[in-house]
Amino acid sequence: MAPSGLKAVVGEKILSGVIRSVKKDGEWKVLIMDHPSMRILSSCCKMSDILAEGITIVEDINKRREPIPSLEAIYLLSPTEKSVQALIXDFRGXPTXTYKAAHVFFTXTCPXPLFSEL
C-alpha cells in the first residue's frame, strides 16, 4: 500500500530517493544532516527505519565529528553556504578525508554559484 499523508510521502521519498538510492548490500553508511534537514527527517521517519536501511550513525554536520574514513557518507543538506562549506571541510582533511566517499542530496534546488563551490 502506498504511503498516505504528507509526512508519510516525504518519509518514503527520503528512504527511497536518498538512502536506498546509494545502498549496497552489507555496506553501512553514515547519514550527515544540517538542522533543517534533521527536522524534516525526524518529523517523518523513525530512527529504526533509517537504521534498517544500513545507516550506522546519524550526525549533525555543524558539530564536531570523529572521522570514519572506512565508511561512505550520505549528506542530506539544505542548500546554504554554511552547510556547503561544512561539507567541503570534511574532505579537506589531511592525511585522510573524514569519510570514504560522499553522496550529496539537497532538500531544495541548490543555487548554481553554491553548487559550483563543490
Swiss-Prot record:
The keyword Protein transport applies. It comes from the Eukaryota. It holds the Pfam family Sec1. Disulfide bonds: none annotated. InterPro entries: Sec-1-like_dom1 (IPR043154), Sec1-like (IPR001619), Sec1-like_sf (IPR036045). Keywords: Exocytosis, Protein transport, Transport. GO terms for biological process: exocytosis; protein transport. Belongs to the STXBP/unc-18/SEC1 family. Involved in intracellular vesicle trafficking and vesicle fusion with membranes. Contributes to the granule exocytosis machinery through interaction with soluble N-ethylmaleimide-sensitive factor attachment protein receptor (SNARE) proteins that regulate membrane fusion. Regulates cytotoxic granule exocytosis in natural killer (NK) cells. Interacts with STX1A, STX2 and STX3. Interacts with STX11. This is Syntaxin-binding protein 2.
